[in-house]
UniProtKB/Swiss-Prot annotation:
HAMAP family: tRNA_metthiotr_MiaB. It is found in: Cytoplasm. It comes from Afipia carboxidovorans (strain ATCC 49405 / DSM 1227 / KCTC 32145 / OM5) (Oligotropha carboxidovorans). This is tRNA-2-methylthio-N(6)-dimethylallyladenosine synthase. Keywords: 4Fe-4S, Cytoplasm, Iron, Iron-sulfur, Metal-binding, S-adenosyl-L-methionine, Transferase, tRNA processing. It catalyses: N(6)-dimethylallyladenosine(37) in tRNA + (sulfur carrier)-SH + AH2 + 2 S-adenosyl-L-methionine = 2-methylsulfanyl-N(6)-dimethylallyladenosine(37) in tRNA + (sulfur carrier)-H + 5'-deoxyadenosine + L-methionine + A + S-adenosyl-L-homocysteine + 2 H(+). [4Fe-4S] cluster 2 binds at C168, C172, C175.
């Protein structure tokens, strides 16, 4: 019997956690078609660019990468090997047929809601004409994407993403997500629980629930009642084997009582929340259509801290939004100083075509913040954020913290895991600790990574008792 050699697949993903998750599901979708992953695009039979449309010149970066892939594709053709190129993700959704017009080497253009149709699109592309699908049948995507095989789950490690929600209804004036991912749609509770159970049965210990606006989750449960994210977390915490639960990314407006209570009542929900605010200026927040004030955001932070004092936060910030004044920027610095973040991401404003903010700046060019001013503000903000992150990390030295060990580190004999706050932590230990949550005494800090040693049994018990007493005090 002659065995057909597997076809090789290379996926390059840009941007958010949702794209990482989507890349895995594309791998699962194409596995029955005989595709296996490769890290080398030069040996791939299919290359997929899984794109992001959030940042400046996203489309141009894609076309630049397509130029490099064209050379690889032509070289493959000279050796008698056919190579297909697909563009997926939010640039595919936004640009559509324009991609194949500008880059004739592209065979498939597929939006985020149509990945389950990849085999059909590839078959269509074999006829010579490019296959393009950028519709919005998002319910079909959730129901039609195949579940990963047990071997694939185990190979991906002890932490996994689970999509619970997709799309956004907020229409922030700077953002393209509602136009590229569509309106908010939530998966049924039963489907999410089934996915999580399958992951747990195959060695996953930590689940991160993801969505463009994850705390807007409003899926139906088995009784037809609408479930909040907080109630969903309660359901997932009951699954055997799941030690940690996270979620990302959240909108301050959608933090409700049930989510606060989940942080109070469920030890598995990690005390680390990514809660983007974008600006500390009420004037800029209004121009962004965020529908909350800086004071609203601070009150939300305080609600979390009241029920879980050890909780920490990260955030996103945009500097140089159209019309941002020195006072507006000073308000942002003041908010960052008041909150005290464990980390944050800051970016210069970049106009996204078709968004209200881009139109606003185009209509009134005086609103545009000069590039040099944006650079200066970004450097100042990032320096403050970096100092806060360094201080937060240094505070771990000398403490015993719980670490979920994920994999072997680059240095021989070391195993790396993550703390409750997603800090990498390295110890010298046997690989058999991978998948376990163990107490680690932190001895030092190297850049953003903690280094320590497995705590002695006596230290571990004392640490866990201390944590338990704190939990009882805060309940």
């Amino acid at each position: 019997m002659i065995m057909t050699p597997p076809r090789k697949l290379h996926i390059k993903s840009y941007g958010c956690q949702m794209n990482v998750y989507d890349a895995q599901r594309m791998v699962d979708t194409l596995a029955p078609e005989g595709f296996v992953e490769t890290a080398d695009p030069a040996e791939a039979d299919l290359v997929i660019l899984n794109t992001c449309h959030i940042r400046e010149k996203a489309s141009e970066k894609v076309f630049s990468e397509l130029g490099r892939l064209r050379v690889i594709k032509e070289e493959a053709a000279r050796t008698g090997r056919e190579m297909k190129i697909a563009v997926a993700g939010c640039v595919a959704q936004a640009e559509g047929a324009e991609i194949t017009r500008r880059a004739s080497t592209v065979d498939v253009v597929v939006g985020p809601q149509s990945y389950h149709n990849l085999p059909k699109l590839l078959a269509k592309a074999r006829d010579g004409a490019p296959a393009i699908e950028t519709e919005f049948p998002i319910e079909d995507k959730f129901s039609a994407l195949p579940a990963p095989k047990p071997a694939a789950i185990r190979a991906r490690g002890v932490s996994a993403f689970v999509t619970v929600q997709e799309g956004c209804d907020k229409f922030c004036t700077f953002c393209v997500v509602p136009y590229t991912r569509g309106m908010e749609v939530s998966r049924p509770v039963a489907d999410i629980v089934a996915d999580a159970k399958r992951l747990a049965e195959n060695g996953v210990r930590e689940l991160t629930l993801i969505g463009q606006n994850v705390n807007a989750y409003h899926g139906d449960d088995e009784n037809g009642r609408t479930s909040s994210l907080g109630r969903l977390l309660h359901r997932l915490a009951m699954l055997p084997g799941i030690a940690r639960l996270r979620y990302s990314t959240s909108h301050p407006r959608d933090v409700d009582d049930s989510l606060i209570e989940a942080h109070r009542d469920i030890p598995a929900v990690m005390p680390f929340v990514h809660l983007p605010v974008q600006s500390g200026s009420d004037r800029i927040l209004a121009a962004m259509n965020r529908k909350h004030t800086a004071a609203d955001y601070i009150r939300t932070i305080e609600r979390f801290r009241k029920v879980r004092p050890e909780i920490a936060f990260s955030s996103d910030f945009i500097v140089g939004f159209p019309g941002e004044s020195e006072q507006d920027f000073a308000d942002t610095l003041a908010l960052v100083t008041q909150i005290g973040y464990a980390g944050a991401y800051s970016f210069k404003y970049s106009p996204r075509p078709g968004t209200p903010a881009a139109d606003m700046q185009e209509t009134d060019t005086a609103l545009a913040v000069p590039a040099a001013v944006m650079d200066e503000r970004l450097a100042q903000l990032q320096a403050l954020i970096d100092a806060q992150q360094a201080s937060f990390n240094r505070a771990a030295i000398g403490r015993t913290v719980e670490v979920l060990f994920e994999r072997a580190a680059r240095e021989p004999g070391q195993i790396v895991g993550r703390t409750a706050y997603l800090q990498p932590a390295h110890v010298m230990a046997s690989p058999d600790i991978i998948g376990k949550v163990l107490p680690v005494t932190i001895d030092s800090l190297e850049r953003y990574s903690l280094k320590g040693r497995l705590a002695s049994e006596e230290t571990a018990v004392a640490s866990l008792r201390s944590t338990q007493r704190e939990s009882e005090t805060f309940a």
